Curated annotation (Swiss-Prot):
The active site is at residue 178. CDD domains: HicDH_like. The gene is ldh2. It is an enzyme of class 1 (oxidoreductase). Its EC number is 1.1.1.27. This is L-lactate dehydrogenase 2.
Amino acid sequence: MKVFNKKVAIIGTGFVGTSIAYSMINQGIANELILVDIDKAKSEGEAIDLLDGVSWGQENVNVWAGDYQDCQDADIVVITAGANQKPGQSRLDLVSINAEIMKTIVNNIMKSGFDGILVIASNPVDVLTYVAWQASGLPVSRVIGTGTTLDTTRFRKELSQRLAIDPRNVHGYIIGEHGDSEVAVWSHTMIGTKPILEIVDTTERLTSDDLPIISDKVKNTAYEIIDRKQATYYGIGMSTARIVKAILNNEQAILPVSAYLDGQYGQQDVFTGIPAVVGNQGVTDIIELNLNAAEKELFQKSVTQLKQVMASLQPNA
């Protein structure tokens, strides 16, 4: 079994990168955190600020500002760098500029001799995870996007608030694109041990009419946040930290990450958000949900949209 030193590098020290670092320190996930940014003074300042709180955390974490060469012996490199989503802009609108940024970053990481696991948190995450995989030359199992982890926790939050229960007792997934074409899998959503479709219309808290409203609210949460504060970062910070924790601790946890499909769900050669088993080898298995007809159709549309965007990035497209 692979033994980790629990050394993690984070590329990009904007709101998302520092939120990931902050979440990891508070949870004692890593032993060493390296912050890498084109603005070295910024990464140095963030490292100093984060270190000031380490003594109140669960573990003693060494946090410092480095460069790409320091990724050489990292267990995980988390990539957050890229252009930010602006009000009125979809995640897919970012694709051209961020694809080029991603290629440059990954090339710099791989030049260091890095041979660990890449976790991608830049948007549009499904497309950029594919770009990172191609640029890295790593096995598909060791290139993981944050996928629909954030969408899934938003989904569980909405249901928990409506039903007045702990969100940790809501079991359900958002799959597909992390974005406008994402799919809520109602057919496999459980409240405790009870299917949610058996609960619908038995309580005034949740009716059939509420289901599409909830799906849309989950889908549009990012836009709502961006309209109010220009960026989202705490939720994705905690979601990314959860993925890193599963890898470093070899949890074999089922998480809705952006993983490579090679025949699963009837799809080929695409990264998208689906439940997958995550441990110290990266993604070791894809969990295939038995989707109903409507969910299959929506998932197909979501994947098709991602493939169209990928095709637009090809030189001769």
